[in-house]
Structures are given as structure tokens and as C-alpha cells.
Amino acid sequence: MNVIEKMFGTHSERELKRIKSTVDKIESLRPQMQALSDEELRGKTREYKNRLQEGETLDDLLPEAFATVREAAKRVLGMEHYRVQLIGGIILHQGRIAEMKTGEGKTLVSTLPAYLNALEGKGVHIVTVNDYLANRDAEWMGKVHEFLGLTVGVVLNSMKNDERRAQYACDITYVTNNELGFDYLRDNMVIYKEQLVQRDLNYAIIDEVDSVLIDEARTPLIISGQSGKSTKLYEVCDILARQLERGEASGEVTKMTAIMGEEITETGDFIVNEKDKIVNLTEQGVHKVENFFHIENLADPENLEIQHNIILALRAHNLMFRDQDYVVKDDEVLIVDEFTGRIMPGRRYSDGLHQAIEAKEHVKVRRESKTLATITFQNFFNKYKKKAGMTGTALTEEKEFRDIYGMDVIEIPTNKPIARVDLEDAVYMTKKEKFRAVVEAVKEAHEKQQPVLVGTITIETSELLSRMLKREGIQHQVLNAKFHEMEAEIVAHAGEAGNVTIATNMAGRGTGIKLDEGSREAGGLKIIGTERHESRRIDNQLRGRSGRQGDPGESRFYLSLEDDLMRLFGSEKLMNVFKSLGVAENEQIEHKMLSSAIEKAQKKIEGNNYGIRKNLLEYDQVNNEQREIIYKERRRVLDGENMRDAIYKMITDTVEHAVDMVFSDDVDQEEWDMNEMNSVLRPIIPLQPITREDIKGMKKNQVKQKLKEEAVKLYEEKEAEFPEAEQLRELERVILLKVIDQKWMDHIDDMDQLRQGIGLQAYGQRDPKVEYKLQAYEMFDSMIAAIQETTLRLLYHVRLEQKVEREQVAQVTGTNKDDSGPKKPVQKTEKKVYPNDPCPCGSGKKYKQCCGRKKIG
């Protein structure tokens, strides 16, 4: 604690003082609430809603509303909120993060702000990390809200759209972060307003907020469809990758070494940089790849795909590990969440990495996907009017919460003092010695019937320890991504006397570990960490599983100098010191230098990871601004707005653009190129050919005016072909939806390509981020122009007798199997396919060489 904190208290202490009087007020209302009958207590909800309509604010109602929920929870669940839980509730209502230690009843705390904010009728989302917790909390805590007359919903992965819509319409909805994000993206791909499932994003209370907003912030949510690319190249590159030899480099290639012209010697065919998770081919490796594929120069643009795929294959073999990063189950590669140890069904690595791993594991290589819609959690949760979070561990990441999400972290005191003892780390020279020591510690605790929870980072380690304990005859349970179905049950029994549980990372987070009498007497739950995680926060979460609500317990981490953290980020000098001391086998090393080296390494990685996430956000911010514009425009179409004015603006913009592009002010009118003007404008707006005679003696602005009038008149003639004006209005909406979706998806793809290639700009002494923004905006402008041109071309060429339904829009996205919206037959254009166009059947051949040939034949 620094001098200022000693004098004035920490930020949390100062904030808690401010709300003390509010908490006192809530507690003083207790007798008043106790005196009410169930019916009268329930009637309070109607009273509060009326008072809101009369002009009172949520803050005015807070003391009474909280006192109401407190009394309702006591009657329905037999649980009354402690004073510290009331404090937590106020912090959450204020849109901040409440750091509450494990076992302090975060789930019960959420009922307070959820009830208060639900009174506005705009919806409250309580966000959990998995379906099990969403369902459990909705059933358990939902009883309190239902008792008070509010509706409670839960959205689960298995639900159809109609069910989801009903659940989101409830006052309070329990839902996982993944379902929320994917529903948001899917809502921006629907073709009828009636198919939307979500309401506006109003207020979110995020449970395990650090897991959602920090750990998962590096993985964007992606909805994808299949692209037409063949998967053969992945298999071929996998064969080659197995033949290439890993080498070493004498230094790191950086911008500085390139400028200084420093020589770096490399051995082998490729170099792996484990710190930054990058693989590079050496000169020797490049020659081998060129010989293998019979190509002259791997760096040529036409060989970009080979280059990309061989790097992917090498990454799959050297940086992605089975039972650590992914598991293979039922002939499928499934990603394991590195922070929770849980399988992430439905998620696939993007950019072809997943296919490279499938080729490595000899399972069916599924076609590479094309991104249809994507968003990061950072940008998604920032869309809420107000958001709050709860977790046991957030203070170490306070800066990130404040900078990126605008939320400060308030540490809530525990209800009872923590009685857990956190022992110094036990460090050994090798992993082998470390695991022996872990088994000994488990054995010792097991003999006195003390329950033990062993935390591992990888599935591999959990299985190795399991084998070692079996040899010692110690009965135990293993909890990792392979057995996640039994997760909650295994965790719930982990605190019983004599039980030994091995779990990867924080599997089972959110399920309380309760002690029985026997385990209390034996010293409470003993936590053993087998490796330090990259983040101190994850280590603290593991420790926090023990010592809940003042229970006894102890925790200790067992490390070795061979652990990844020490190997990659620890100082080599330090390693050499201990090696030169000649530590005997199985002897524990204890040294202040060592403890501070571990702490430094973790801080270094945390800073590094924060940098990666901040960088990702800065790039995604560009996508986000563009996404907002497109989704807003799309929603206008969906809401059934009359698009006539928008179409007329497109017509005038297109004419302006064409005239500005072809006719220059600096050139004499005699030199204006009529042929070019006709070839630019007439494919979009089928005007009569423009001749020099037509515009004789006119200035450029007069030409614009004349062409605009002709184009508008032509469109009015098209309108007159339709018996009812609404037929054309609906047609405009259909075509706009289809074109926006098509162009936006292509744009997402182009942005991906731009993002991957932008790093090379750094070598050209230009700031990659600035370049990315400039190019992205140029691309966006081109996309908007393309949307306008394609929309007009289709509308001007539409024929009344063609009947095609709005469902054709869904074929663009390949999603939307929902049939809950109304279906009206409308007129629609059918795009002509020319002989040299790609064949619509998706074969990748030209139309004349595929289906076109069949028609001719």
C-alpha cells in the first residue's frame, strides 16, 4: 500500500464509505418489510413501476426495492442478503465491477440490481459462462423474481428461435455470453422483422466478468458459411510439414535488426517463436517447399495460398497441442478454452488453422469457412446502455476494465475473515521432481482425510497425475474437457472428507465447494497448483476455491524450472545460478529471488496479453464503426421503412459520381469522352445513349441535372408498371437486403485479408494501424458505392412478371432456416448469368464449361 492509500484509504474503501448511508437505509426498512403479507410484498412491484412513471428514478427507489428483494429471498429461499451483499448489489446497479471472494454468494447479490432495473420494463440480462449455470440460476434465483411478479427467462443453446424470442421478452433473462453474441449477429442477418429474437441491449450483469470480458476477448464470435475452396492442399501441406526439420535462430528478426542489417544465422527448415506463437521458414525451408511443389518462387503472389498453408501446417504441428489446445472426439477436432479447460462446441479456429489441425490428426478435413458475421465481446458488451460485473478476481486487471470498458473495480469485504493459509511456492529443478512432490503432498493430506483439489493447466498433466495417484492406490476424480458432462457433480463433492479431485484450470467455476464436518476438522480444502498460469488472476481463482465463508483451508503452488512460464519468461541468469548451486535431486528450492522472478514473469505476460487485446480492439474498432452503419441501415429496411427516398438519393449520387469521374472541368467540352460516359452509366441506369448533341453548350452541372432528371423519370416509369406501389416498395427492400448482405460479407473477407497483410507496412516505416484505417475506409466507401450501383442495376432491370420471394435473401447468407416470419410473394429480379461468370452451382468452373454447357447440349 502506498503513502496516499495509507492516508486516504484505497479507491474501494473510499467508495464504500460513500454508500454506507444507503446500506443503513436498506437495513432500517427490514421491520417494515417483515410486517407485510406475501400479497402486500408482491404489490410493491406495481407500486414501484407507477412511481417510476410519475418521475421517480431507480436511485430513488433503490433502498425500498433492495429491502423488498431481501425480504422476498428470505421467504422464498430461506436466504437473507448479508450487509456485504447489499453493498455488492449497489455497486452492480451503478454499472461497476464488484470483486467478491468465492463463496460470498454472488448469485444472490445479482437478484438486487436485476429486480430494480427490471422495473423499467426494458429487460435485464444476467450473463453466465455456461448453460448449466444459466439454467441453475434461472430456476433457483428466478423464484424470488417470480414471487415478486416479474417474468424470468433462460436462453439455452438447444432452443429454437420462437423459444428464444419468448425468453428475451421476459423481464429478466439468464443467458450465456456466447448465446447473447451469436443471437445479436443472427438478428442482423434475418429477412423479416418478426424473426428478430432480441430486444434492445439495456442492462447486463455479467457473472465471472473477468472470464467473459478479458479471457475470451481475444476470440471473436464468428458466424460462418462454407466457402468453395478444396481441402486437398491442407493434406498435402501436412505431409510436407512432417518432413521439414525444426531449427534455431541466433537472434530475433525485428524491425531494428532489419534496419541495422544485422546477420542472423538460422539452422533447419523453420524457426518456431514460442513467445509470440509464430513460425517462419528459413531459406533452406523455402527451397524445400519450392522443390516439393515444383514452383520457382514461393514469394510470388500466385503462390500465396501454398505459403499460407505450409505455415498453418507447421503451426498445427509445433504450436497446437492435443489435449491442451484441443481434443479429438468422435472424429472431430474440438477447441479447449485455455482459461477454463472446457470444450467450446461449435467454435472453430479461423483462417484455415482448424483444417490444418484436422489434417494433422487424420480426421475428416472440413471445408474452410467464409465469415458471414463477426464481433468481439469488447464491442458487443459496449453496446449495452449499462453493464456491471461480478467476480472473485478483478483487481489485477483493473486498468483494462477502466480503459476498455469504462468500469471501475470495487473490492467488497468478505462477510467473515478469510481463514485460508496461502503457503510459499515449492520450486524444484525438474518437472519429474515436482510431480513426485505433488503426489507426496496429496498422499499426506489423504491419510488425514483432508480433501484435496489439484489444479492443472493441461489435460495431459491431469492424466499424468491421475496415473501416478493410481499407482499409489489413491482414489480420485478427474475433471477435464474430456469429462465435462459430470463437471458440477464432481466439483460439488470435492470438499468432502478424503476426496481427491484433479481439475484443469477453473473447470467447475461457479459451483460452490462445500465442506463437511470431517473435512473441516482435517484442515479444510487443500489446494495444490501444479504450475503457475500466465495470469496471476487465474492462480488467485484456484486459491479462492478454498476458504469460502470463513472456512479453514490452505493453498500452495508446486513449480519447476522446466515449466513453460519459467522457461519462456524467467531470466536465464537465475536458472544458471540455481544450476551452479548443484541442488540435490528432489530437494525443494526456496529463494526470494525466485518468488519475485515468477511474479515479474507473470506481470510481463499480463502486460503482453493486455497489449494484444488492446491492439485487437483498436483494429476491431474500425470494423465496429462500419458494422454499426451497415446494421443500422439494414434495420431500417427491416422495419419496413419506405425506401423510395433512399433509392432516389442513390440515383442522383450515382449520376453525380459518373459525371465527376468522366467529365473534367479542366478539359474543353469537345474533348469529353461520350463512349466512356455511356459505358460507365448505362449498365447501371439504362438511359438512352448520351450523344454530344444532347449536351451541346451545357456546363458540367447542367449535364448532371439533365441526366438526374432523365434517370428519375425512367424510375418513375418503372414504378408505373406495378399495379400497387407497395409491390415495388417491398421489392426495393428485398433487393437492398440481398445486396447489403452480399457486399458486406465480401467486405468482411477483404478486411480479413487487409488485416493479415498490414503487418508488412511496418517494414515500410509506416504505422500499420494508420494504414489499416485509411485503407479500410477507402474499401468501405467502395463497398457503399457497389451497394448503390448493384441495387439500382437490379431495380431498373426488374420485370413485373417475375415472382421471387424474400427468402432468396437468406440464400445469400446461407443461414436463417427460421420460418416464423410471414411470407408474401413479391416481384423480384433474376440475375442473368453470362458465359464467363462463375457457375451459380458453386463448382468453381465458368458457367459455359459447367451448367451452361448442359443447357446448350
Q: Language model features by range: what are they?
A:
Residues 1-582, 631-632, 649, 653, ...:
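Conserved P-loop NTPase motor core
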Residues 829-848, 852:
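Short Cys/His-rich zinc-binding micro-motifs
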Residues 454, 502, 744, 780, ...:
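Hydrophobic, well-ordered secondary-structure elements that form the walls
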Residues 254-260, 472, 823-832, 850:
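Intrinsically disordered, compositionally biased charged tails
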Residues 449-462, 639-641, 692-696, 840:
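Short, Lys/Glu-rich amphipathic helical modules
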